[in-house]
Amino acid sequence: MGFAFDGDADRCLAIDSDGNEVDGDKLIAVISAEMKRNNTLKNDTAVITVMSNIGFWKFCDKNGIKAVKTAVGDRYVLEEMLKSGYNIGGEQSGHIIFLDYATTGDGQLTAVQTLCTMKKRGESLKKLAEIMTCYPQTLVNIRVTPEGKAALSSDEAVKAAIAEAEEKLCS
């Protein structure tokens, strides 16, 4: 197994013993589940972004963890964590904030937290990562004007269609 960091080491992804990627969503799942077991997960909640895999929501439902969704960007994750008193949050990209230790993403801290969880549980990362199933996910960017974005964001029919699709996928 191993860890990979971006250029300034604020992001961390892991590779399990079979060479499978363990992304930020799975790392947050593994670590937040351990925090919940140890009664250190504040309000039993993890903060994630709209980019998170639907598998994270299913993991939360199955494990009694609440997920709060923010816009993409660590600043939005941190803002929600500070506002509501949560202590773990992050992005699929591996940008994870552990508010008990820092107010920014720290890839090395993510690696240490992952290793500590492995040691406490006595299990490999491969085994721990099985706690969450990643579902196929596609990102499609659609260009819209700022006015169009505002109109779509506030359109009740669009909101209802999104909620209906999320409900179907999460059940």
Model-derived segments and spans:
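Extended, compositionally biased non-globular segments that define protein topology
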Residues: 29-30
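Phosphate-binding and adjacent anionic-ligand microenvironments
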Residues: 1, 38-171
